Amino acid sequence: MNTQHSKTDVILIGGGIMSATLGTLLKELTPEKDIQLFERLSQPGEESSNVWNNAGTGHSALCELNYTKEGKDGSVDITKAIHINEQFQISKQFWAYLIREGHIESPDKFIQSVPHMSFVKGEENVKFLKSRVASLQKNVLFEKMKISQDPEKINSWVPLMMEGRQSDEAIAITYDETGTDVNFGALTKKLIANLQQKNVGINYKHEVLDIKKLNNGNWQVVVKDLNTSNVMNYESKFVFIGAGGASLPLLQKTKIKESKHIGGFPVSGLFLRCKNPDVIHRHHAKVYGKAEVGAPPMSVPHLDTRFVNGEKSLLFGPFAGFSPKFLKNGSYLDLVKSVKPNNMITMLSAGVKEFNLTKYLVSQLMLSNEERINDLRVFLPEAKDEDWEVITAGQRVQVIKDTDKSKGQLQFGTEVITSEDGSLAALLGASPGASTAVDIMFDVLQRCYKSEFKSWEPKIKEMVPSFGLKLSEHEDMYHSINEEVKKYLNVK
């Protein structure tokens, strides 16, 4: 085993959408920095970013009902929906900039216009959906949203969903043509190809073994070349851990105080994938339903048109599975090894409190294929068993952490953890994840490059014209920027 030493300015751990985005931002803002990226697999974007390991929804709260809460008085709080949409607007602006400048090309290879729709059944749910739309339509970001209970209108949007449906059933559906399907794996590959052209060191089949703080304030990152078994010690001023499910174990190796009292619970996803081309081509939308009362946000059912390498696909899910692995290509010991003295109480507290999650997972694990098809028939009443197959999607590690309110709180969003001195950052969690990558990486830069960030703002505003402002509060700016975005990304 040979040990070598090398110095660099930035180390990115993980070859997914987060590291690719942060690397791209850094090369635009400070091109002189030396950057090294390490990925354990043989190519980028193969874990959570892979097209089959996520639903590819450009999360904009156009269809996801869990981003709007209903109050006891019937009012609907749209605060989170606006925030999620604003984050995706930032991503789209940055991608449009990269296309305009020629850094990446062929947007149709990673983003497609696919209408986003919400679908509910029952009088109470219909009432909620109407209130939701009435609240959202007042905001410029949601001005194109439509709602209908008319069977003929709904049939014109999603004919397959109306075939065989009972006419006396109370249903309502929303429709927003500005929705998108995003292949984050393809986008990741484009971003990393661009980084390679800018002399970023892209190292595949390299596994990070350890991360240690040095006396001089830098980090020592121990990396093993899986091709040769050589081990190299890298010294870096800044480290970003964007390794999906592996981020938590790597963060724990740093021993920073911010890594304490954080745990993770892995959940795997299963989808039904359509095998019948006729069915696939007769549906063109991402249709999100409503989770059962008490079920976790990850359980929201959706019927998704996908585009994979130019070919149209159709998925339904997710159904939860369980594996103690933190990555699809991980170890069965991942969960056990993540339990430390400093997070044991955190994990146990969550186990006691999260009865609904436990109940949901047990019920999901007991589902037969016939029962999964029955769930699909809520969306497609005439779905045939032989047209669908089960596929395993990616692993998600839900963050468990102590909060001011209590110990062991399960978190369903995306979490950025940074060291006190800003020399290290890690990304944990799941949805909305990739859709918000650009905004999240701006957050990382603001926290970790405080002294430089102000001087970067003119360039940032060139890349993302709305930076620092809320498009939801600047109607004219939104329309102006959106026209540019539509032109370069070729979306509606």
From Swiss-Prot:
Keywords: FAD, Flavoprotein, Oxidoreductase, Tricarboxylic acid cycle. This is Probable malate:quinone oxidoreductase 1. GO terms for biological process: tricarboxylic acid cycle. The keyword Oxidoreductase applies. Pfam families: Mqo (PF06039). It catalyses: (S)-malate + a quinone = a quinol + oxaloacetate. The lineage of its organism: Bacteria, Bacillati, Bacillota, Bacilli, Bacillales. Gene3D superfamilies: D-Amino Acid Oxidase, subunit A, domain 2 (3.30.9.10), FAD/NAD(P)-binding domain (3.50.50.60). Its cofactor is FAD. One of its GO terms (molecular function) is 2-hydroxyglutarate dehydrogenase activity. Belongs to the MQO family. InterPro entries: FAD/NAD-bd_sf, MQO. Pathway: Carbohydrate metabolism; tricarboxylic acid cycle; oxaloacetate from (S)-malate (quinone route): step 1/1. PANTHER family: L-2-HYDROXYGLUTARATE DEHYDROGENASE, MITOCHONDRIAL. Its EC number is 1.1.5.4.
